[in-house]
Amino acid sequence: MQIWPHKHIHTLANFSIKDYESVFELANRFDALKNAGTKKIPALQGTLVTSLFFEASTRTKNSFELAAKRLSADVQTFAPSSSSLTKGETIIDTAITYSAMGADTLVIRHSSSYITFEIAKKLDAINSKTSVLNAGDGLHSHPSQGLLDIYTLIKFFSPQTLNPEVLNSKKILIIGDVNHSRVARSNLWALSAFGADIILCGPKALIPDEFINFLKTPAPNQTEDPVKSRGSITISRSLEESIKTADAIIVLRLQKERMMENLLSSIDSYSLDYGLTPEKLSLNNKEIPILHPGPINRDIEISSKVVDRYPNCLINNQVANGIPIRMALLYLLQKHNK
């Protein structure tokens, strides 16, 4: 395994193929240990992981905390409503405070895009050894979700060898609210790195035409793309046509909390055109995998029948795979700092 090059993890835009492979290799090891009955190992014993979540979360927050505990790290949690934020303290000063308490890694979720870059820059300026791990920042990025999604697809398409190259030329259909989705942006970086051809499907209000050029937008302070050749992005407005040739589908939630009022004419019309149902799935002659990062809006973007009855609905697999992926990220950051 290569020496891990990142002190902080903000985005997948600056991940190389070797970076992905390092994460997946470790995740495979941790998953194998769990399957063999070993649920806890002393890999991060004596380290402190601090969970700073300024937005609501079920899957990501609890998955990161469980991942840290399985590595034997101490876990420190944070409640915004009972913190000094209510007295006017800034998020950056809050992060510096937890770093001063000895946090080795800050796992941060916040509604502001690029906030983890700002926090990391401040910490580095005071020579802090604390790493920052982005657990979702505004509309920008959700690296661990992008990693666990691609890991779930790799395990589906290549269960014996777990070879990421299996995604090369696969047609991955992403349906729904791409414009407000940090998950979608991370998926675009991750899937394209392994040569997947990505189809974005939804109305123009949720998938503007400029997303066709998304992969030409680097991360802050990034001068070049570490991936030499990426897959493609196309945009479709017809779910029925797109579904016919798809090898996998990722459904996205309508993020009404981030939308401008009246962005969509109606939820019912959106569901009629772009909701994933058994009838629409029947247009594809393969039993393709279905993913959704959660939380689900049942019978809006995805039918309950698909969630509960479709044999290759991998939503629970995604949740399970999130733990070894996040274990790998926490472990790699600590090894970088030693």
From Swiss-Prot:
Residues that bind L-aspartate: K87, R182, R253
Recorded catalytic activity of this chain's protein: carbamoyl phosphate + L-aspartate = N-carbamoyl-L-aspartate + phosphate + H(+)
Keywords, alphabetical: Pyrimidine biosynthesis, Transferase
InterPro entries (UniProt xref): Asp/Orn_carbamoyltranf_P-bd, Asp/Orn_carbamoylTrfase, Asp/Orn_carbamoylTrfase_sf, Asp_carbamoyltransf, Asp_carbamoyltransf_Asp/Orn-bd
Residues at which carbamoyl phosphate binds: R59, T60, R109, H142, Q145, G294, P295
One Pfam family this sequence matches: OTCace_N
Top-level EC class: transferase
EC number annotated for this UniProt entry: 2.1.3.2
Gene3D superfamilies: Aspartate/ornithine carbamoyltransferase
PANTHER family (UniProt xref): ASPARTATE CARBAMOYLTRANSFERASE (PTHR45753:SF6), ORNITHINE CARBAMOYLTRANSFERASE, MITOCHONDRIAL (PTHR45753)
Complex formation: Heterododecamer (2C3:3R2) of six catalytic PyrB chains organized as two trimers (C3), and six regulatory PyrI chains organized as three dimers (R2).
Function, as annotated: Catalyzes the condensation of carbamoyl phosphate and aspartate to form carbamoyl aspartate and inorganic phosphate, the committed step in the de novo pyrimidine nucleotide biosynthesis pathway.
Stated name of the protein: Aspartate carbamoyltransferase catalytic subunit
Gene coding for it: pyrB
